[in-house]
Amino acid sequence: MASLPILAITSGEPAGIGPELCAQLSRRDWPLRPVVLGDFELIRARAAGAAVVRAYMPDAPAAAGVLDVLHVPLNVAARPGRLDPANAGYVLALLDRAVHGCRSGEFGAIVTAPVHKGVINDAGVAFSGHTEYLAEHTGTPRVVMMLVGGGLRVALATTHLPLAAVPGAITPALLDETLRILHADLAGRFGLAAPRILVAGLNPHAGEGGHMGREEIDVIAPVLERLRGEGMRLVGPLPADTLFVPHTLGQGDAVLAMYHDQGLPVLKHASFGGGVNVTLGLPIIRTSVDHGTALDLAGTGRADPGSLFAAVELATAMVCNRDVAR
């Protein structure tokens, strides 16, 4: 019988809550085996006796209450709540090892605990986030950020841009590529054979027939019409204020929002801290928590693992859907 896929869980910033969140994975039995990538002694210390921490062996069976750790050594000792640029290389080494394992077939997916972008940049490494790093290191020219939680799937046409820059970034080429990636991953990794995507407009009231902006008429609608002609089930452009009501949301499988704060506040309100960040378009599956390093909680034992658990659950479902689709 073939062994089940392994999920690589990167433990993230060592001064943050990532290591202790990862230690809590031993509290549950998982359909696929989670393996934590991190410094062995760091993870064991943050587990604080709540789990049996053992060295990762590829062929060892999963065991209740046991946490498998693939040892990646810290550069310098880590203290809860105290960032040290000397460990930036360690954080990136976790990601590199996880990507290598996914590309080689050792791992079925990556689940990432939070990193601290600022301290990585302080170390002299230009780093804008997991998403961009993974795209670069897998040779992926375009990826799409989607948040999942509270019964919603919300993808973004643009991500971390100033609001003033968003209209110029919403081009036919960007929307075409974004919708193709979203559609492909909903079908191949979410098990939705013919996904229905609700597309938000950019302007209030979706432009009010051109009286409040013409992006809907000149850019968004023509792209949707062309892709409908290829068989995609697309609804929109819809006014965002009425799109995010239960009746409308119930008519679609996912939402494409035009910018970060158009879509994510609704999802984060609905998910109650259990949201999951998914990177679409990669050749590998990657999910992540939807929160930061929470340095003030590190080492206190009070960090909530809900988002990490949800990220592991979603990665598991995506692996299973992908394998069925193959």
From Swiss-Prot:
Residue positions binding a divalent metal cation: 160, 205, 260
InterPro entries: PdxA, PdxA_fam
Catalytic activity: 4-(phosphooxy)-L-threonine + NAD(+) = 3-amino-2-oxopropyl phosphate + CO2 + NADH
A matching Pfam family: PdxA
One Gene Ontology CC term in the entry: cytoplasm
Cofactor note: Binds 1 divalent metal cation per subunit. Can use ions such as Zn(2+), Mg(2+) or Co(2+).
EC number in record: 1.1.1.262
Compartment annotation: Cytoplasm
This protein's UniProt keywords: Cobalt, Cytoplasm, Magnesium, Metal-binding, NAD, NADP, Oxidoreductase, Pyridoxine biosynthesis, Zinc
Name this polypeptide is given: 4-hydroxythreonine-4-phosphate dehydrogenase
Gene field: pdxA
Residues binding substrate: 130-131, 268, 277, 286
Pathway(s) the chain acts in: Cofactor biosynthesis; pyridoxine 5'-phosphate biosynthesis; pyridoxine 5'-phosphate from D-erythrose 4-phosphate: step 4/5
Family the entry assigns: Belongs to the PdxA family.
Assembly and binders: Homodimer.
